[in-house]
Amino acid sequence: MLKEIKWKVNNLPKGDKENCIKFLNEEEITKVRNFHKSFPQYKETPLANLEGLAKKLGVAGVYVKDESYRFGLNAFKVLGGSYSMGRYLAQRLDTDISELGYDKLTSKEIKEKLGEITFFTATDGNHGRG
């Protein structure tokens, strides 16, 4: 049983948008979200409410994302791989990924344009790098 809870204070400046990583802007985040929402298997990740921990910490709530439901693969890592493949296919089709949802990507027309393509993904552990 957990006897001690440790935390690290985040001393990074708040609201310093100018120094954020540029590819993580609102427009790109929206593209990523919309791309994944176009998949029929997509479901929002449920949150587990850790009421006991919240009470012990004296806070209103503590929630943890349950990634075991992510596309039936038990991990969040699929998101980076699928989006990377989507962007590659968009590049091959000379279009923006925001124009390519699941239905279009899996259409006969797109399959004929792209031909046979094989993807391989791998990870180097629990770091989410593919």
Predicted regions, residues:
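PLP-dependent amino-acid enzyme catalytic core
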Residues: 1-130
